[in-house]
Amino acid sequence: TLDRSSAASDVYKRQVVMEAERFATSVQEPGTQWTVIPDLGRTLSGLSLMPYTKPVSGASLTYQMRLKSDLSGVRVRLILDSTLPFIKGGHSYAIRLDDGEEQIENYNSDLTWANCYSKMYPAGAARVIESKVTFPGVTLEVGVHTLTIRPLSPAIVLHKIIVDCGGDMSGRLNLTESPRTRTLK
């Protein structure tokens, strides 16, 4: 279990920041592997299911966080590599908090030539895409919670996860990771 205390300091009272490689559990099918890409961009690393030529079915990453106060107004921000949509319709992932309803998010379908100046070029220059998913009506109570991410398309590269409950700290890559400890079982 990772201790991601939202009450550790004023900076983290309303959000939890996790590097992608700090997952609690990973699942992958035979012939695929979750691969850490060290020093990718301005984060600790990137994380992707490889090889990209294999199906992504059955793969997932689960993150754990221990909260010391109740948090509501949950919004998860995933910082992803700026992969252009080489798959018709773009790249998608599924995301779920605890045992709640899974949400499907397409994060790059609008990176097309029709949007080259407003969407595609800015994403390429920033080298990242910020994908936001809201969980209306969800309150995270004191204790351990899980966040599960399933790729629905190949070539998704995850940099950072930000569980934001009103902290609204600006920034993506420059946010310092929340304090953490690993408990070995």
Annotate the PLM regions.
Residues 56-58, 81-166:
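Beta-strand-rich ligand-recognition modules
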Residues 36-50, 173-185:
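Short, surface-exposed polybasic-and-hydrophobic patches located at secondary-structure transitions
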Residues 155-184:
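Exposed low-complexity, polar/acidic, P/S/T/G-rich flexible segments that act as propeptides
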Residues 10-37:
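Predominantly extracellular/luminal regions of secreted and cell-surface proteins
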Residues 17, 22-24, 64-66, 137-139, ...:
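Generic structural detector for well-ordered beta-strands
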Residues 44-69, 73, 135:
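Short beta-strands within extracellular/lumenal beta-sheet-rich domains
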Residues 23, 61, 67-91:
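A short beta-strand element within beta-rich, extracytoplasmic domains
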Residues 1-8, 12:
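Single conserved hydrophobic/aromatic residue that forms the stacking wall/gate
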